Amino acid sequence: MATIRVLANARQLIDALAEHGPLSPAEAAKLLEIPRPTVYRLAEALAAVDLVEPLPDSRLALSHRWLRLAESARLGLTEWEGAGEILDRLAESTRQTAFLSVPRRTGAVCVAWAQGYDVGILLLRPGRSLPYHAGAAGRVLLALAHPNPDEFLEGAPIESFTAETMTEAASLSRDLDEIRARGYSVSDEDVTVGVGAVGMPVRDASGQVIAALSLSGFAGEIAAKRDEYVAATFEAVAELEVLNS
């Protein structure tokens, strides 16, 4: 049991560094609600296997080894072979950035993207994740792929990224109902100020939602051309679903 607890604490530390970026041992201890000496021991062990590295200012950060691990994991997703070309065409035709994300335990993980002209303003990248309640990909997956959305909502109020992030159970529940009714999600500055997106579910041959395709850019442009972008994303989704048919 002690070994399991140590591994659980190590995973929590890794998840915290992935979500928040470099942290001091004191910040990590407070965030994870574990003693600071425990953080030091975990960091030393993870550094020994090149998963965490200490920075010159004594903060802890994920090592560059995670980039290789993420790339290996991405290449292992053989069901998405050929998805890159589809995303490239979508990004080229709309000039927005296209993301393919899959559901995981804590949120939507980006496995592929095609960069638009405004990529510098976006938070999501391949290998990164966003929680289920924020962003077009996360919320469409929460509505249509999460095994128990009500249980997720029981954790509200949830972390806020901007003033537009929905953090209360009531507003999120209404949003999920709207997503199910119209078939896609709309993100309007709920992750990054000035950024919007639309997100659509991608289904396998059995009809199960296995991923989300989202298109993101400046909020004003996404809002002004929403119908056009939804139609373009829908066409790309149809192509992606052929890969899994």
How does the language model describe each region?
Residues 1-76, 80, 238, 242-243:
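N-terminal helix-turn-helix
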Residues 3-7, 63, 76, 80, ...:
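Short, structured helix-loop boundary elements
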Residues 16, 31, 84-93, 99, ...:
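Amphipathic alpha-helical regulatory segments at dimerization interfaces
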Residues 55, 104, 204:
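Acidic surface patches and DE-rich sequence motifs
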Residues 58-156:
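Amphipathic alpha-helical effector-binding/dimerization core
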Residues 142, 151-160, 237-245:
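Cysteine/selenocysteine-centered motifs that mediate thiol-based redox chemistry or coordinate metal-sulfur cofactors
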Residues 165-239:
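Extended hydrophobic
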